[in-house]
Each structure stands twice: as structure tokens, then as C-alpha cells.
């Protein structure tokens, strides 16, 4: 029996090499689909001594051998996800295959040697593409390898307009178009079109410790004062009161108060009482201080997925991609499969994904890099 989407998950029980494990995951995913159009493959190398340095490329080759007519995007990461399951710190692979009847793809692979100054324009153009003959996109999936973890790359994607853009930062990325041999690449961008709707849920794993405060003075990446107090004093006082080992995080307020953009504190200037974050905020921005929190993470993801499910009553989830921060998983929850099971409870559809260095999702109508966030990209069939 064929479907419009298929998934696969494999680990050391299916083989002792990335090639064998990826092959097993892809075979499961492809078997469910009559006419594969796009195939996402995610690998995890586990112990670096056992891992494969070109794991994404190996996976892409295995995928093309089994689905030669599909566009293939492969990425290597600390862990992989499938429906209700996660695999961390071990050799594993997951795969998601979608049928040509529901999704068509325009795939762009950025060369590994592309200079940083070329990342912005190349990614902006890749995200704006449409499959041949299509006038409207469903969404864009962008996976960035380590060499494309650059401000220029993020700026190129931030300016994307139109269909939702999701994705993540991986260690290795590879891609292949039908009839073209797979290549390792700096980034792979799959622009999708078809009779599906893509809905995105981004859920940060944080709990706020302070009220919202105004950035009353800033200098580039440095926040100098918060509500006219030296920012370093505010952070020091909050850290003492919280008495937690977890580092404080800066939460940037958006349109949705309960979905802040999370940033780490990157440094301090004691002379000015300023702190630096990996972002530039205009004066007047509202921020709070917070920490990672497993209960808040679990509850927020479940709540947001429930809201989406109610809003899409009558529409059927067809498939999902999930990108979760590598700072979540067992390290945060003390147990495996938490994010994947939470998604499955509200979206019982073929799923694949990975743990990531950062996540890409819309925030205040702009694509931004997220931290400590679970991003669920759910493809719905119209009611």
C-alpha cells in the first residue's frame, strides 16, 4: 500500500556503518511512496571515533541509489528524530520521503568553497526559487553546513518573503538532484510547491526570571543599560537571586510574548557595565532574562501544537520535519524521545528530523536563527 509520505528510522541494530544504517532508513521511507519527489535524510555519527567524516554525503549516495528520481537533502547532526523516537549519541539515521503528487521541489546546493560574502545573495536567490511550472510555493527547507553558519547566510534567509522557511544548522550537508551525483555542500535549500499547507510551530525551552525590561542604551552587540540600569548589574543580581547553575539567557520580546527569541550572553564589558549578545537590538527593544527549563519546554511545545491542531480542524497532517536544539533532548529532559513524542501526540504522521546547532523559523514575520527551540514543520492536506 502506497502513501503520500513515508518515514524511516534505523540504528546500530540495522547495521554497523552509516552507509548501512542510512540505507535501511531510506528503504523504509521510499517503500511507502509510489513516486518519490523529495527525500530528507538525517544521520548521527555518535562516537567521533566510529563516525564517518562524510556521513551526509554517504547518506545522500545511498538515498540516490534507492530513489534516483528524487531530490535528496542529507545532513549529519548530533542526533536524529522520527515519529515518536529520538536517537542521540549513537550511529543512527532517519528519513522522510514525499510523493510527487503532493510536493515538487527546486533544489539548490551551495558550493563548499563559496566565499562568505556570497552566502547572502546565494541563499536569498535559492529560497526565492519555485519548481518549474509552479506559481506559488508551499515552503522552503534550508539546511546549513558548518561553513555556512555565518551572519551573511542568516541575513540572506532573513529577507525571504512568501512561503514559510524552516531549517537548521548541521555539521555536514549533502544534496543531489535527479541524474546528478550527490555532492557535499555548504548549504542545501529545497523550495517546495504542491497541494499542501506548511504550518510552523517554534517552541523555546525557556522560563523567564524577570519582567520585560527596555533596552535603554545599546552599542552594536552590547546592551549597555536595561531600564536605565547597567545591564551587567541586572544580570548579576538576577543570577544571584536565581542561584542556578544554568547560564542566564536573554529573551527578546516579539509579537507573541510567550515565544521570545533566545540569545546567549556572549561576553561582558565591566568598565561600561555592558553585556554582549549574538544579535543587535535597537534601543527600545524589550528583553527579559531566563533559563532553560524542561517543564516549560515540554508544556509550551504541547500547548502550541494543540493550538495548531484546533486551528486546522478537518485538515489531515501528511508529514512533518522536526528540528530540535542539541541543548534539548536527554541533556535537558533527563529522558529521550520527549520532543518527538510530544509532536506525535498531535501530529500522527510520518516524521523525520535532527538535533541542530540552531533552528530556522519565522519570528515576527522574519526568518531568524533560534536557540534551545523545537521547530515543527507540519505539512497538512486541505480538508
Regions found by a protein language model. Give the residues of each.
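Small-residue-enriched flexible segments
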Residues: 1-64, 70-71, 75-349, 354-383
